[in-house]
Swiss-Prot record, chain A:
It comes from Lachnoclostridium phytofermentans (strain ATCC 700394 / DSM 18823 / ISDg) (Clostridium phytofermentans). This is 3-isopropylmalate dehydratase small subunit. Pathway: Amino-acid biosynthesis; L-leucine biosynthesis; L-leucine from 3-methyl-2-oxobutanoate: step 2/4. GO terms for biological process: L-leucine biosynthetic process. The keyword Phosphoprotein does not apply.
UniProtKB/Swiss-Prot annotation, chain B:
It comes from the Bacteria. CDD domains: IPMI (cd01583). This is 3-isopropylmalate dehydratase large subunit. It comes from Lachnoclostridium phytofermentans (strain ATCC 700394 / DSM 18823 / ISDg) (Clostridium phytofermentans). Gene3D superfamilies: Aconitase, domain 3 (3.30.499.10). Keywords: 4Fe-4S, Amino-acid biosynthesis, Branched-chain amino acid biosynthesis, Iron, Iron-sulfur, Leucine biosynthesis, Lyase, Metal-binding. [4Fe-4S] cluster binds at C300, C360, C363. Heterodimer of LeuC and LeuD. Binds 1 [4Fe-4S] cluster per subunit.
Amino acid sequence: MKSHGIVHKYGDNVDTDVIIPARYLNSSDPKELAKKCMEDIDKEFVNRVNLGDIMVANKNFGCGSSREHAPIAIKASGISCVIAETFARIFYRNAINIGLPIIECKEAARDIDAGNEVEIDFDSGIITNLTKGTSYQGQAFPEFMQKIMKADGLINYINEQLEAV
Amino acid sequence: MGMTMTQKILAAHANLPEVKAGQLIEANLDLVLANDITGPVAIHEIQRLKKKTVFDKDKIALVPDHFTPNKDIKSAEHCKCVREFAKEHDITNYFEIGEMGIEHALLPEKGLIVAGETCIGADSHTCTYGALGAFSTGVGSTDMGAGMITGKAWFKVPAAIKFILTGEPKEWVSGKDVILHIIGMIGVDGALYKSMEFVGAGIKNLTMDDRFTIANMAIEAGAKNGIFPVDDLTISYMKEHGAKPYTIYEADEDAEYEQIITINLSELEPTVAFPHLPENTKTVKEAGEVRIDQVVIGSCTNGRIGDLRIAAKVLEGRKVAKGMRAIVFPATQAIYLQAIEEGLIQTFIKAGCVVSTPTCGPCLGGHMGILAAGERAASTTNRNFVGRMGHVESEVYLCSPAVAAASAVTGKISEPSELFS
Protein backbone atom coordinates (compact mmCIF):
# COMPACT_ATOMS: atom_id res chain seq x y z
CA MET A 1 0.00 0.00 0.00
CA LYS A 2 1.38 3.40 -1.01
CA SER A 3 0.31 6.99 -0.73
CA HIS A 4 1.52 9.92 -2.78
CA GLY A 5 0.71 13.62 -2.52
CA ILE A 6 1.60 17.19 -1.68
CA VAL A 7 2.45 18.14 1.91
CA HIS A 8 0.50 20.44 4.22
CA LYS A 9 2.88 21.32 7.05
CA TYR A 10 2.13 22.23 10.69
CA GLY A 11 4.09 22.73 13.90
CA ASP A 12 4.02 21.34 17.46
CA ASN A 13 0.95 20.49 19.55
CA VAL A 14 -1.71 20.68 16.83
CA ASP A 15 -4.74 20.02 19.03
CA THR A 16 -8.05 18.44 18.09
CA ASP A 17 -9.88 21.72 18.81
CA VAL A 18 -8.12 23.37 15.85
CA ILE A 19 -8.43 20.25 13.69
CA ILE A 20 -12.20 20.39 14.16
CA PRO A 21 -13.59 23.12 16.44
CA ALA A 22 -16.25 22.13 18.98
CA ARG A 23 -18.81 24.45 17.37
CA TYR A 24 -19.03 21.90 14.53
CA LEU A 25 -19.35 18.82 16.75
CA ASN A 26 -23.12 18.89 16.56
CA SER A 27 -22.57 16.96 13.31
CA SER A 28 -20.95 13.56 12.95
CA ASP A 29 -21.18 13.45 9.14
CA PRO A 30 -17.63 13.06 7.73
CA LYS A 31 -18.42 15.26 4.68
CA GLU A 32 -19.69 18.10 6.90
CA LEU A 33 -16.69 17.78 9.25
CA ALA A 34 -14.26 17.79 6.29
CA LYS A 35 -15.55 21.21 5.18
CA LYS A 36 -14.40 22.69 8.51
CA CYS A 37 -11.17 20.72 8.92
CA MET A 38 -8.21 22.82 10.19
CA GLU A 39 -10.35 25.99 10.00
CA ASP A 40 -8.95 27.57 13.18
CA ILE A 41 -5.29 27.05 12.25
CA ASP A 42 -5.30 27.09 8.43
CA LYS A 43 -8.37 28.65 6.82
CA GLU A 44 -7.15 27.85 3.29
CA PHE A 45 -6.54 24.14 3.94
CA VAL A 46 -9.94 22.97 2.68
CA ASN A 47 -9.48 24.91 -0.59
CA ARG A 48 -5.90 23.71 -1.07
CA VAL A 49 -6.18 20.02 -0.19
CA ASN A 50 -6.38 17.37 -2.92
CA LEU A 51 -7.21 13.69 -2.60
CA GLY A 52 -4.10 11.78 -1.54
CA ASP A 53 -2.28 14.75 0.02
CA ILE A 54 -0.17 14.28 3.14
CA MET A 55 -0.15 16.15 6.43
CA VAL A 56 3.17 16.60 8.23
CA ALA A 57 3.56 18.01 11.75
CA ASN A 58 6.04 18.09 14.60
CA LYS A 59 5.48 17.00 18.22
CA ASN A 60 2.30 15.79 19.94
CA PHE A 61 -0.05 15.94 16.94
CA GLY A 62 -3.72 15.55 17.90
CA CYS A 63 -3.38 16.49 21.57
CA GLY A 64 -6.36 17.49 23.72
CA SER A 65 -9.93 16.35 23.30
CA SER A 66 -10.58 12.69 22.44
CA ARG A 67 -13.00 13.66 19.68
CA GLU A 68 -12.84 11.03 16.95
CA HIS A 69 -14.27 13.72 14.68
CA ALA A 70 -10.66 14.96 14.29
CA PRO A 71 -9.17 11.98 12.41
CA ILE A 72 -12.54 11.51 10.65
CA ALA A 73 -12.39 15.12 9.37
CA ILE A 74 -8.77 14.73 8.22
CA LYS A 75 -9.51 11.45 6.42
CA ALA A 76 -12.67 12.83 4.81
CA SER A 77 -10.80 15.92 3.59
CA GLY A 78 -8.72 13.65 1.33
CA ILE A 79 -5.54 13.34 3.40
CA SER A 80 -3.99 9.90 2.86
CA CYS A 81 -1.51 9.91 5.76
CA VAL A 82 -0.32 12.04 8.68
CA ILE A 83 3.40 12.03 9.48
CA ALA A 84 4.48 13.50 12.83
CA GLU A 85 7.37 13.39 15.23
CA THR A 86 4.98 12.12 17.92
CA PHE A 87 1.20 11.75 18.27
CA ALA A 88 -1.01 12.27 21.30
CA ARG A 89 -2.12 8.80 22.39
CA ILE A 90 -5.88 9.12 21.97
CA PHE A 91 -5.48 10.53 18.46
CA TYR A 92 -3.06 7.71 17.62
CA ARG A 93 -5.60 5.06 18.68
CA ASN A 94 -8.47 6.83 16.95
CA ALA A 95 -6.58 7.14 13.67
CA ILE A 96 -5.83 3.41 13.64
CA ASN A 97 -9.40 2.57 14.66
CA ILE A 98 -10.96 4.54 11.80
CA GLY A 99 -8.35 3.62 9.20
CA LEU A 100 -6.41 6.89 8.83
CA PRO A 101 -2.76 5.93 8.20
CA ILE A 102 -0.29 7.68 10.52
CA ILE A 103 3.49 7.38 10.81
CA GLU A 104 5.84 8.59 13.52
CA CYS A 105 9.14 9.78 12.03
CA LYS A 106 11.16 12.57 13.65
CA GLU A 107 13.53 13.01 10.71
CA ALA A 108 10.74 13.29 8.13
CA ALA A 109 8.70 15.61 10.32
CA ARG A 110 11.64 17.99 10.64
CA ASP A 111 12.99 17.83 7.08
CA ILE A 112 9.85 17.86 4.94
CA ASP A 113 8.58 21.32 3.98
CA ALA A 114 5.14 22.55 2.97
CA GLY A 115 4.46 21.86 -0.69
CA ASN A 116 6.99 19.02 -0.99
CA GLU A 117 5.86 16.00 -3.00
CA VAL A 118 6.07 12.89 -0.84
CA GLU A 119 5.53 9.17 -1.34
CA ILE A 120 4.97 6.70 1.51
CA ASP A 121 5.34 2.93 1.33
CA PHE A 122 3.33 1.58 4.27
CA ASP A 123 4.76 -1.94 4.08
CA SER A 124 8.36 -0.82 4.52
CA GLY A 125 7.64 2.43 6.44
CA ILE A 126 9.92 4.29 3.96
CA ILE A 127 8.96 7.91 3.30
CA THR A 128 10.42 9.40 0.09
CA ASN A 129 10.65 13.14 -0.44
CA LEU A 130 10.48 13.43 -4.24
CA THR A 131 11.08 17.20 -4.13
CA LYS A 132 14.31 16.99 -2.13
CA GLY A 133 15.37 13.53 -3.29
CA THR A 134 15.70 12.27 0.29
CA SER A 135 14.14 9.36 2.14
CA TYR A 136 13.41 8.58 5.78
CA GLN A 137 12.62 5.39 7.68
CA GLY A 138 9.31 5.68 9.53
CA GLN A 139 8.46 3.59 12.57
CA ALA A 140 6.79 0.25 11.83
CA PHE A 141 3.58 -0.57 13.70
CA PRO A 142 3.38 -3.35 16.28
CA GLU A 143 1.91 -6.53 14.78
CA PHE A 144 -1.34 -6.13 16.74
CA MET A 145 -2.00 -2.67 15.25
CA GLN A 146 -1.11 -3.93 11.80
CA LYS A 147 -3.87 -6.52 12.22
CA ILE A 148 -6.38 -3.77 13.03
CA MET A 149 -5.25 -1.76 10.02
CA LYS A 150 -5.33 -4.78 7.71
CA ALA A 151 -8.93 -5.36 8.82
CA ASP A 152 -9.55 -1.66 7.99
CA GLY A 153 -10.30 -0.55 11.50
CA LEU A 154 -11.24 -1.87 14.93
CA ILE A 155 -14.88 -2.68 14.18
CA ASN A 156 -13.98 -5.04 11.32
CA TYR A 157 -11.20 -6.54 13.43
CA ILE A 158 -13.65 -7.28 16.26
CA ASN A 159 -16.09 -8.80 13.76
CA GLU A 160 -13.30 -11.12 12.59
CA GLN A 161 -12.64 -12.07 16.23
CA LEU A 162 -16.35 -12.70 16.81
CA GLU A 163 -16.49 -14.96 13.74
CA ALA A 164 -13.47 -16.92 14.94
CA VAL A 165 -15.12 -17.74 18.29
CA MET B 1 10.65 -6.35 38.46
CA GLY B 2 7.93 -4.62 40.47
CA MET B 3 4.88 -2.92 39.02
CA THR B 4 3.50 0.58 39.31
CA MET B 5 0.00 1.08 40.74
CA THR B 6 -1.42 1.45 37.23
CA GLN B 7 0.37 -1.67 35.97
CA LYS B 8 -1.04 -3.69 38.90
CA ILE B 9 -4.62 -2.69 38.09
CA LEU B 10 -4.08 -3.51 34.42
CA ALA B 11 -2.47 -6.88 35.19
CA ALA B 12 -5.40 -7.85 37.42
CA HIS B 13 -7.90 -6.89 34.72
CA ALA B 14 -5.95 -8.77 32.04
CA ASN B 15 -5.78 -11.87 34.29
CA LEU B 16 -1.99 -11.80 34.16
CA PRO B 17 0.43 -12.25 37.07
CA GLU B 18 2.47 -9.30 35.83
CA VAL B 19 2.72 -6.81 32.99
CA LYS B 20 5.60 -4.66 31.73
CA ALA B 21 5.72 -1.22 30.17
CA GLY B 22 5.22 -1.47 26.42
CA GLN B 23 3.37 -4.80 26.56
CA LEU B 24 0.07 -4.97 24.65
CA ILE B 25 -2.75 -6.40 26.73
CA GLU B 26 -6.50 -6.77 26.64
CA ALA B 27 -8.14 -5.67 29.87
CA ASN B 28 -11.63 -6.19 31.25
CA LEU B 29 -13.58 -3.00 31.83
CA ASP B 30 -15.65 -2.08 34.88
CA LEU B 31 -17.17 1.06 33.37
CA VAL B 32 -17.59 2.49 29.87
CA LEU B 33 -18.64 6.11 29.43
CA ALA B 34 -19.97 8.27 26.60
CA ASN B 35 -21.53 11.71 26.22
CA ASP B 36 -23.76 13.43 23.68
CA ILE B 37 -20.87 14.33 21.34
CA THR B 38 -18.98 11.06 21.33
CA GLY B 39 -21.93 8.72 21.92
CA PRO B 40 -23.64 9.09 18.51
CA VAL B 41 -20.38 8.33 16.66
CA ALA B 42 -19.96 5.18 18.75
CA ILE B 43 -23.60 4.15 18.34
CA HIS B 44 -23.19 4.50 14.57
CA GLU B 45 -20.08 2.25 14.69
CA ILE B 46 -21.87 -0.33 16.84
CA GLN B 47 -24.45 -0.75 14.05
CA ARG B 48 -21.61 -2.26 11.99
CA LEU B 49 -20.72 -4.84 14.65
CA LYS B 50 -21.90 -8.41 14.31
CA LYS B 51 -22.74 -8.45 18.05
CA LYS B 52 -25.12 -5.66 19.03
CA THR B 53 -25.89 -6.38 22.67
CA VAL B 54 -24.00 -4.46 25.34
CA PHE B 55 -21.70 -6.43 27.63
CA ASP B 56 -23.38 -5.27 30.84
CA LYS B 57 -26.18 -2.70 30.98
CA ASP B 58 -25.11 -1.72 34.53
CA LYS B 59 -21.51 -0.93 33.53
CA ILE B 60 -22.22 1.70 30.91
CA ALA B 61 -22.76 5.37 31.69
CA LEU B 62 -24.34 7.72 29.16
CA VAL B 63 -24.24 11.37 30.16
CA PRO B 64 -25.51 14.01 27.73
CA ASP B 65 -23.63 16.99 29.16
CA HIS B 66 -21.75 18.82 26.40
CA PHE B 67 -24.44 20.55 24.35
CA THR B 68 -27.18 20.14 26.95
CA PRO B 69 -29.69 21.50 27.67
CA ASN B 70 -29.90 21.03 23.89
CA LYS B 71 -28.37 24.10 22.28
CA ASP B 72 -29.75 23.60 18.78
CA ILE B 73 -31.59 21.12 16.57
CA LYS B 74 -28.50 19.11 15.62
CA SER B 75 -27.54 18.76 19.31
CA ALA B 76 -31.08 17.75 20.15
CA GLU B 77 -30.83 15.00 17.54
CA HIS B 78 -27.52 13.79 18.96
CA CYS B 79 -29.05 13.66 22.44
CA LYS B 80 -32.07 11.84 21.06
CA CYS B 81 -29.76 9.26 19.46
CA VAL B 82 -28.08 8.62 22.85
CA ARG B 83 -31.44 8.58 24.68
CA GLU B 84 -32.93 6.04 22.27
CA PHE B 85 -29.85 3.83 22.51
CA ALA B 86 -30.10 3.93 26.31
CA LYS B 87 -33.75 2.95 26.12
CA GLU B 88 -33.21 0.19 23.57
CA HIS B 89 -30.42 -1.40 25.61
CA ASP B 90 -32.02 -0.67 28.99
CA ILE B 91 -28.90 1.19 30.13
CA THR B 92 -29.12 1.67 33.91
CA ASN B 93 -26.91 4.74 34.12
CA TYR B 94 -28.37 7.15 31.59
CA PHE B 95 -28.78 10.63 33.07
CA GLU B 96 -31.33 13.11 31.77
CA ILE B 97 -30.71 16.77 32.59
CA GLY B 98 -32.71 16.85 35.82
CA GLU B 99 -30.54 14.16 37.38
CA MET B 100 -27.33 14.86 35.55
CA GLY B 101 -24.10 16.64 35.90
CA ILE B 102 -20.85 17.01 34.04
CA GLU B 103 -19.80 13.40 33.54
CA HIS B 104 -16.50 13.44 35.44
CA ALA B 105 -18.06 15.02 38.51
CA LEU B 106 -21.21 12.91 38.25
CA LEU B 107 -19.77 9.39 38.00
CA PRO B 108 -17.73 9.50 41.23
CA GLU B 109 -20.61 11.29 42.97
CA LYS B 110 -22.98 8.47 41.99
CA GLY B 111 -20.46 5.87 43.18
CA LEU B 112 -20.21 4.36 39.69
CA ILE B 113 -16.43 4.14 39.78
CA VAL B 114 -14.24 3.12 42.73
CA ALA B 115 -10.64 2.26 43.58
CA GLY B 116 -9.05 -0.60 41.66
CA GLU B 117 -11.49 -0.50 38.77
CA THR B 118 -10.87 0.15 35.08
CA CYS B 119 -12.80 2.69 33.04
CA ILE B 120 -12.64 3.96 29.49
CA GLY B 121 -14.62 6.97 28.41
CA ALA B 122 -15.03 8.70 25.10
CA ASP B 123 -13.94 11.95 26.64
CA SER B 124 -10.33 12.82 27.27
CA HIS B 125 -10.93 13.91 30.87
CA THR B 126 -12.00 10.39 31.86
CA CYS B 127 -8.60 10.27 33.59
CA THR B 128 -10.32 12.15 36.48
CA TYR B 129 -11.19 8.93 38.36
CA GLY B 130 -7.53 8.27 39.04
CA ALA B 131 -8.19 10.45 42.09
CA LEU B 132 -10.04 7.44 43.55
CA GLY B 133 -7.22 5.01 42.78
CA ALA B 134 -8.89 3.66 39.63
CA PHE B 135 -7.34 3.23 36.18
CA SER B 136 -9.34 5.44 33.89
CA THR B 137 -8.46 6.87 30.53
CA GLY B 138 -9.96 8.73 27.60
CA VAL B 139 -10.47 7.03 24.25
CA GLY B 140 -12.27 7.78 21.02
CA SER B 141 -15.77 6.75 20.03
CA THR B 142 -14.79 3.53 18.23
CA ASP B 143 -12.77 2.22 21.19
CA MET B 144 -15.63 3.16 23.49
CA GLY B 145 -18.29 1.57 21.25
CA ALA B 146 -16.25 -1.62 21.06
CA GLY B 147 -15.89 -1.50 24.86
CA MET B 148 -19.66 -1.20 25.33
CA ILE B 149 -20.15 -4.40 23.33
CA THR B 150 -17.14 -6.50 24.35
CA GLY B 151 -16.44 -5.21 27.88
CA LYS B 152 -12.76 -5.09 26.96
CA ALA B 153 -10.17 -2.70 25.58
CA TRP B 154 -6.60 -3.15 24.35
CA PHE B 155 -3.87 -1.15 26.03
CA LYS B 156 -0.18 -0.66 25.68
CA VAL B 157 0.97 -0.93 29.31
CA PRO B 158 2.28 2.52 30.21
CA ALA B 159 5.60 3.46 31.77
CA ALA B 160 5.25 5.98 34.58
CA ILE B 161 6.47 9.21 36.09
CA LYS B 162 6.36 9.38 39.89
CA PHE B 163 5.46 12.69 41.49
CA ILE B 164 6.37 12.84 45.17
CA LEU B 165 4.23 15.54 46.77
CA THR B 166 5.43 16.93 50.10
CA GLY B 167 4.33 19.76 52.37
CA GLU B 168 1.07 21.64 52.64
CA PRO B 169 -0.30 24.17 50.15
CA LYS B 170 -0.51 27.79 51.28
CA GLU B 171 -3.83 29.58 51.61
CA TRP B 172 -5.42 30.17 48.17
CA VAL B 173 -3.30 27.43 46.58
CA SER B 174 -5.32 24.41 45.44
CA GLY B 175 -5.15 21.32 43.24
CA LYS B 176 -5.48 23.48 40.13
CA ASP B 177 -2.29 25.34 40.98
CA VAL B 178 -0.51 22.03 41.60
CA ILE B 179 -1.44 20.55 38.21
CA LEU B 180 -0.83 23.80 36.30
CA HIS B 181 2.60 23.99 37.94
CA ILE B 182 3.35 20.40 36.91
CA ILE B 183 2.19 20.90 33.30
CA GLY B 184 4.27 24.07 33.14
CA MET B 185 7.24 22.06 34.34
CA ILE B 186 6.98 18.99 32.08
CA GLY B 187 5.05 20.38 29.09
CA VAL B 188 1.89 19.32 27.26
CA ASP B 189 3.65 16.17 26.05
CA GLY B 190 5.79 15.67 29.15
CA ALA B 191 3.94 12.51 30.14
CA LEU B 192 3.04 11.33 26.62
CA TYR B 193 1.79 7.69 26.70
CA LYS B 194 2.72 7.47 30.42
CA SER B 195 1.04 7.24 33.82
CA MET B 196 1.39 10.08 36.28
CA GLU B 197 1.52 8.44 39.71
CA PHE B 198 1.18 10.78 42.67
CA VAL B 199 2.61 9.71 46.04
CA GLY B 200 4.02 11.29 49.18
CA ALA B 201 3.13 12.82 52.53
CA GLY B 202 1.70 15.93 50.88
CA ILE B 203 -1.29 14.02 49.53
CA LYS B 204 -3.00 14.01 52.92
CA ASN B 205 -3.10 17.82 52.60
CA LEU B 206 -5.10 17.63 49.37
CA THR B 207 -8.89 17.35 49.48
CA MET B 208 -10.71 14.86 47.22
CA ASP B 209 -11.76 17.83 45.08
CA ASP B 210 -8.09 18.84 44.73
CA ARG B 211 -7.20 15.30 43.69
CA PHE B 212 -10.01 15.13 41.13
CA THR B 213 -8.71 18.38 39.61
CA ILE B 214 -5.14 17.08 39.42
CA ALA B 215 -6.08 13.68 37.93
CA ASN B 216 -8.50 15.40 35.54
CA MET B 217 -5.73 17.42 33.91
CA ALA B 218 -3.22 14.56 33.53
CA ILE B 219 -4.31 14.42 29.88
CA GLU B 220 -3.11 18.01 29.52
CA ALA B 221 0.43 16.69 29.99
CA GLY B 222 -0.29 13.98 27.41
CA ALA B 223 -0.61 11.25 30.04
CA LYS B 224 -2.55 8.04 29.62
CA ASN B 225 -3.76 8.37 33.20
CA GLY B 226 -3.09 10.07 36.50
CA ILE B 227 -3.51 8.11 39.73
CA PHE B 228 -3.52 8.66 43.49
CA PRO B 229 -3.00 6.15 46.29
CA VAL B 230 -6.09 5.18 48.29
CA ASP B 231 -6.10 6.65 51.80
CA ASP B 232 -8.71 7.21 54.54
CA LEU B 233 -10.08 10.23 52.72
CA THR B 234 -10.61 8.20 49.52
CA ILE B 235 -12.30 5.42 51.48
CA SER B 236 -14.65 7.80 53.29
CA TYR B 237 -15.50 9.47 49.96
CA MET B 238 -16.34 6.10 48.40
CA LYS B 239 -18.44 5.08 51.43
CA GLU B 240 -20.35 8.34 51.24
CA HIS B 241 -21.02 7.86 47.53
CA GLY B 242 -22.53 4.42 47.08
CA ALA B 243 -20.21 2.08 48.94
CA LYS B 244 -19.53 -0.21 45.98
CA PRO B 245 -16.85 -2.85 46.80
CA TYR B 246 -13.38 -1.56 45.95
CA THR B 247 -9.85 -2.94 45.70
CA ILE B 248 -6.73 -1.12 46.86
CA TYR B 249 -3.64 -1.54 44.70
CA GLU B 250 -0.28 -0.16 45.73
CA ALA B 251 2.85 0.25 43.65
CA ASP B 252 5.63 -2.23 44.45
CA GLU B 253 8.70 -0.94 46.29
CA ASP B 254 10.82 -1.82 43.25
CA ALA B 255 8.45 -0.46 40.62
CA GLU B 256 10.25 1.21 37.75
CA TYR B 257 9.67 4.90 36.98
CA GLU B 258 11.09 6.75 34.01
CA GLN B 259 11.32 9.91 36.05
CA ILE B 260 10.85 10.90 39.70
CA ILE B 261 9.85 14.48 40.41
CA THR B 262 9.51 15.92 43.92
CA ILE B 263 7.19 18.87 44.48
CA ASN B 264 6.97 20.74 47.76
CA LEU B 265 3.36 21.93 47.84
CA SER B 266 4.19 24.67 50.35
CA GLU B 267 6.39 26.40 47.74
CA LEU B 268 3.63 26.70 45.13
CA GLU B 269 1.92 30.00 44.32
CA PRO B 270 -1.40 30.73 42.62
CA THR B 271 -0.66 29.88 38.99
CA VAL B 272 -2.17 30.79 35.65
CA ALA B 273 -1.71 29.23 32.19
CA PHE B 274 -1.43 31.83 29.44
CA PRO B 275 -2.80 31.29 25.93
CA HIS B 276 -2.68 29.06 23.97
CA LEU B 277 -1.31 26.04 25.82
CA PRO B 278 -1.80 24.74 29.38
CA GLU B 279 2.02 24.59 29.68
CA ASN B 280 2.42 28.39 29.36
CA THR B 281 2.31 28.89 33.10
CA LYS B 282 3.30 31.82 35.25
CA THR B 283 2.56 32.59 38.86
CA VAL B 284 -0.16 35.21 39.20
CA LYS B 285 2.49 37.53 40.65
CA GLU B 286 4.44 37.23 37.37
CA ALA B 287 1.35 37.66 35.19
CA GLY B 288 1.46 41.44 34.93
CA GLU B 289 -1.58 43.49 33.94
CA VAL B 290 -3.96 41.14 32.08
CA ARG B 291 -7.41 42.74 31.71
CA ILE B 292 -10.25 40.24 31.29
CA ASP B 293 -13.82 40.35 30.00
CA GLN B 294 -15.24 37.09 31.30
CA VAL B 295 -14.74 34.67 34.17
CA VAL B 296 -15.89 31.05 34.09
CA ILE B 297 -16.02 29.08 37.35
CA GLY B 298 -16.97 25.41 37.00
CA SER B 299 -16.38 22.46 34.61
CA CYS B 300 -15.26 18.86 35.19
CA THR B 301 -12.00 20.34 36.43
CA ASN B 302 -13.27 22.84 39.00
CA GLY B 303 -17.05 22.72 39.43
CA ARG B 304 -17.21 20.74 42.67
CA ILE B 305 -18.52 21.99 46.00
CA GLY B 306 -15.03 22.75 47.35
CA ASP B 307 -14.34 24.87 44.28
CA LEU B 308 -17.59 26.81 44.69
CA ARG B 309 -16.93 27.36 48.39
CA ILE B 310 -13.53 28.92 47.64
CA ALA B 311 -14.98 31.14 44.92
CA ALA B 312 -17.82 32.24 47.23
CA LYS B 313 -15.36 33.00 50.01
CA VAL B 314 -13.61 35.45 47.67
CA LEU B 315 -16.84 36.94 46.29
CA GLU B 316 -18.68 37.23 49.64
CA GLY B 317 -19.74 40.85 50.12
CA ARG B 318 -17.99 41.96 46.93
CA LYS B 319 -19.12 42.86 43.42
CA VAL B 320 -17.67 41.76 40.12
CA ALA B 321 -15.98 44.56 38.16
CA LYS B 322 -18.11 46.83 35.99
CA GLY B 323 -18.57 45.18 32.59
CA MET B 324 -17.35 41.77 33.83
CA ARG B 325 -19.32 38.68 32.77
CA ALA B 326 -18.90 36.09 35.52
CA ILE B 327 -20.52 32.70 34.95
CA VAL B 328 -20.69 29.97 37.59
CA PHE B 329 -21.40 26.34 36.64
CA PRO B 330 -21.97 23.88 39.48
CA ALA B 331 -20.79 20.55 38.05
CA THR B 332 -23.82 18.47 39.04
CA GLN B 333 -27.40 18.92 40.19
CA ALA B 334 -26.42 17.64 43.66
CA ILE B 335 -23.57 20.15 43.90
CA TYR B 336 -25.94 22.90 42.70
CA LEU B 337 -28.45 22.00 45.43
CA GLN B 338 -25.75 21.87 48.09
CA ALA B 339 -24.49 25.28 46.94
CA ILE B 340 -28.03 26.65 47.34
CA GLU B 341 -28.33 25.13 50.82
CA GLU B 342 -24.98 26.58 51.87
CA GLY B 343 -25.90 30.04 50.59
CA LEU B 344 -23.16 30.04 47.94
CA ILE B 345 -25.55 30.73 45.07
CA GLN B 346 -26.91 33.83 46.86
CA THR B 347 -23.32 35.02 47.27
CA PHE B 348 -22.65 34.58 43.55
CA ILE B 349 -25.81 36.34 42.45
CA LYS B 350 -25.36 39.22 44.91
CA ALA B 351 -21.83 39.63 43.56
CA GLY B 352 -23.23 39.99 40.06
CA CYS B 353 -22.44 36.53 38.67
CA VAL B 354 -24.85 34.39 36.67
CA VAL B 355 -25.34 30.79 37.73
CA SER B 356 -25.99 28.11 35.13
CA THR B 357 -27.35 24.61 35.08
CA PRO B 358 -24.54 22.00 34.87
CA THR B 359 -23.11 21.85 31.34
CA CYS B 360 -19.74 21.57 29.60
CA GLY B 361 -20.89 24.49 27.40
CA PRO B 362 -18.27 27.25 27.61
CA CYS B 363 -15.29 25.00 28.35
CA LEU B 364 -15.23 23.66 24.80
CA GLY B 365 -16.70 26.71 23.14
CA GLY B 366 -20.04 25.03 22.67
CA HIS B 367 -22.52 27.45 24.22
CA MET B 368 -23.17 29.50 27.39
CA GLY B 369 -20.34 32.00 27.40
CA ILE B 370 -18.68 32.10 23.98
CA LEU B 371 -16.01 34.74 23.43
CA ALA B 372 -15.87 37.31 20.62
CA ALA B 373 -12.68 38.34 18.80
CA GLY B 374 -10.22 40.07 21.10
CA GLU B 375 -11.93 39.02 24.33
CA ARG B 376 -10.18 37.36 27.24
CA ALA B 377 -11.48 34.91 29.83
CA ALA B 378 -10.04 33.76 33.13
CA SER B 379 -11.40 30.27 33.46
CA THR B 380 -11.24 27.31 35.81
CA THR B 381 -11.59 24.97 32.82
CA ASN B 382 -8.83 22.75 31.43
CA ARG B 383 -7.78 23.92 27.97
CA ASN B 384 -6.82 27.24 26.43
CA PHE B 385 -6.10 26.21 22.84
CA VAL B 386 -6.67 28.61 19.94
CA GLY B 387 -10.42 29.19 19.63
CA ARG B 388 -11.24 26.87 22.52
CA MET B 389 -13.90 29.14 24.07
CA GLY B 390 -15.00 30.89 20.91
CA HIS B 391 -13.38 33.15 18.33
CA VAL B 392 -9.86 32.23 17.18
CA GLU B 393 -8.73 35.68 18.29
CA SER B 394 -10.07 35.24 21.82
CA GLU B 395 -7.87 34.15 24.73
CA VAL B 396 -8.34 31.83 27.70
CA TYR B 397 -6.27 32.02 30.89
CA LEU B 398 -6.56 28.88 33.01
CA CYS B 399 -6.61 29.31 36.77
CA SER B 400 -8.07 28.12 40.07
CA PRO B 401 -11.53 29.09 41.38
CA ALA B 402 -9.87 31.43 43.90
CA VAL B 403 -7.93 33.29 41.22
CA ALA B 404 -10.96 33.34 38.88
CA ALA B 405 -13.16 34.85 41.59
CA ALA B 406 -10.55 37.45 42.55
CA SER B 407 -10.07 38.33 38.88
CA ALA B 408 -13.83 38.78 38.46
CA VAL B 409 -13.73 41.42 41.20
CA THR B 410 -10.67 43.33 39.97
CA GLY B 411 -11.23 42.92 36.23
CA LYS B 412 -7.71 41.58 35.75
CA ILE B 413 -5.81 38.38 36.61
CA SER B 414 -5.37 38.72 40.38
CA GLU B 415 -4.42 36.87 43.53
CA PRO B 416 -7.18 36.52 46.14
CA SER B 417 -4.75 37.75 48.79
CA GLU B 418 -4.88 41.20 47.11
CA LEU B 419 -8.50 41.46 48.27
CA PHE B 420 -7.84 40.29 51.82
CA SER B 421 -4.83 42.39 52.76
